């Protein structure tokens, strides 16, 4: 699954902070893992693409997408 959001560099730092504050891990090659969801960031100027590569089997792709959308609405205020 791939989702793209408009986001500033400052907000991207907030995203990374939120992941680590909620028990997630961010790796040096822009991969991340949080609560069984694995993926990677692709950052380009003011666009952030999140690619989800793995998820818990109980979580639907739609659920993951909805959570991402909710999070980015909140982070962009």
Language model features with spans:
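A general marker of short, structured functional hotspots
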Residues: 1, 8, 23, 67-68
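Ser/Thr-rich, low-complexity intrinsically disordered terminal regions
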Residues: 14-17, 21-40
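Short, surface-exposed beta-strand/loop "edge" segments at domain boundaries and coil↔beta transitions
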Residues: 37-41, 56-59
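C-terminal structural segments of small proteins and small subunits
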Residues: 48-77
């Amino acid at each position: 699954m791939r989702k793209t959001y408009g986001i500033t560099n400052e907000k991207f730092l907030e995203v990374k902070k939120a992941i680590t504050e909620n028990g997630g891990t961010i790796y040096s090659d822009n991969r991340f893992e949080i609560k069984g969801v694995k993926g990677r960031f692709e950052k380009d100027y003011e666009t952030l693409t999140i690619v989800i590569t793995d998820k818990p089997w109980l979580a639907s792709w739609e659920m993951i997408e909805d959570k991402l959308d909710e999070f980015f609405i909140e982070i962009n205020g």
